[in-house]
Amino acid sequence: MTKNNNPNIVKNSLGYDSNLYIYQDKTMFNYSVDTILLANFVFINQKIKNILEIGTNNAALSIFLAERDEKLKIDALEIQEKAFKIAKMNVDYNEKNSQISLINADFNDFWKEKIKTSQMKYDSIVCNPPFFPIKNTKQSKKLTKEMLIATHEVKLTLENIIEGSAKIIEQKGYLTMVIPVERLVDCFFLLRKYKFEPKRVKFIIPRIYDKPKLVLVEARYQAGWGVHFLPNIYLHDSENKHIHIYREEVKKLYKPIRKKEK
């Protein structure tokens, strides 16, 4: 077991009833339901062999994805050195080193270097992006520098992600993200701009009478038109906003959905 004397670092289970655990720093961005829902929304089949995660943070998403298919090879990219070190701790602890390669780099530099040095392109790219525009956001004094970079477009914008992904993804490769509903129009516009076609869209809604807050989006590079709006995910049954028990449907998604073998 990995030892750490930092009081801000805690060990949490990753999903329900699984053998996966991760260390998280309470002063940094921590995984939540959107991480899990995104990990199980990512399309995986026999043809998907290599995946890039942009902004892995503590590697929760990549570890969950690796558990879905033991043959997957994942490059997990993280710009923040502090988060990168925690990600390494988590990959080591969950024994995923044979599947996950951690890369401490800025995505804007990474994709430019990759097209110079490697002909290999990714079958799939996944990202839980820093989605708040920095100029339009009133910043809380409680927000640490690490959390600001993880949640706001300080180092990386939505357009950076989509533009760079187009350079290093296979034709008809999958780009999958979770974003706030407010950014959906921006997302569709940018996807089309860089030759991606939205294919699957799924809204995440806290309760049945609430507005959607997040949306899962899958797009494919240089693919034909045609988008499918899938049934919504409702997180909680109760209208009482003080009750936060997940619905059974959501609990089932808290376990890695393994790739079906032929």
Residue positions per predicted region:
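Short, Lys/Arg-enriched, disordered terminal segments
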Residues: M1-S18, E113-M120, I257-K262
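Conserved SAM/SAH cofactor-binding pocket of Class I
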Residues: V42-S118, S124-C127, P133-K138, E163
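Class I SAM-dependent transferase core
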Residues: K3-N45
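Mobile active-site "lid"/loop adjacent to the S-adenosyl-L-methionine
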Residues: P129-N160
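Conserved Class I SAM-dependent methyltransferase catalytic core
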Residues: Y21-Y23, T27, Y31, V154-P212
